[in-house]
């Protein structure tokens, strides 16, 4: 919620931020209406200063980075191929996974070659091929710290620099390729 005096907006109007469009908009708390353009009666000079201070891409990106990346945590995406010896041999793609560990390894090696050749990204491949429910988010696992993941996965992930992709990592869940995002 924004302060009317600081924003230069008429009474009952405030600046809000659209999550879907990632843009600021104007909301009238009395009438519950919103609009993309400032309402009539706005002190445009005050609004410009307010918008530059709180809604410029640089200040907003800095705030998001400070808020979103917790201390000591990293963000990764992964592509998981399960096999019949996996901890839970089922996924959103298959109710019962019957492939052997060797078949899973061969499959993941093929994916690894495609990613390394640049023909497809890990995220694009994860959308259709990963056995993890994170597939719908391009394999993005969000932020995690030490002790949050299986040790083998965690060790491989923390060894990566942002933008790097691991070799094949074997855990109780299955076989993974991991990409460090942040």
Curated annotation (Swiss-Prot):
This is Peptidyl-prolyl cis-trans isomerase ssp-1. It comes from Neurospora crassa (strain ATCC 24698 / 74-OR23-1A / CBS 708.71 / DSM 1257 / FGSC 987). CDD domains: WW. GO terms for cellular component: cytosol; nucleus. Its EC number is 5.2.1.8. It catalyses: [protein]-peptidylproline (omega=180) = [protein]-peptidylproline (omega=0). One of its GO terms (biological process) is regulation of primary metabolic process. Site-specific PPIase with respect to the amino acid N-terminal to the proline residue. Peptides with glutamate, phosphoserine, or phosphothreonine in the -1 position are the best substrates. It is not only able to isomerize small peptides but is also active in protein folding. PROSITE patterns: PPIC_PPIASE_2, WW_DOMAIN_1, WW_DOMAIN_2. The keyword Isomerase applies. GO terms for molecular function: peptidyl-prolyl cis-trans isomerase activity. Disulfide bonds: none annotated.
